[in-house]
Amino acid sequence: SDQHAAGAAAVAHLIARGHRDIAFITGSLDSPTGLERLSGYKSALAQQGIAVNEALIVEGKWNAQSGVAAVDALLAGGQPFSAIVAGNDEMAIGAMKRLAERGVAV
């Protein structure tokens, strides 16, 4: 699907730039869109032989506040990551805002 392809393309782009520990802020996993984008994320990692780290997957709710909360959860989780893919622009904006507030270069 287009949603699967979108998730995969974002991850493939980051892998091509050298990232291996890629976090993913999903959309709501009770929605087909959220599930398809997550599937694309996992497929792109698998195609490059990179194991999925479930600790780097955080469910969001399609809004900026859930992007903020997801970054807090990722940082609290203690698993290193060098990039984040968000399921939509609103969550990405929230994530970027929180990373900047926490002193993480974006």
Q: What residues fall within each predicted segment?
A:
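Bacterial carbohydrate/catabolite-sensing allosteric modules
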Residues: S1-V106
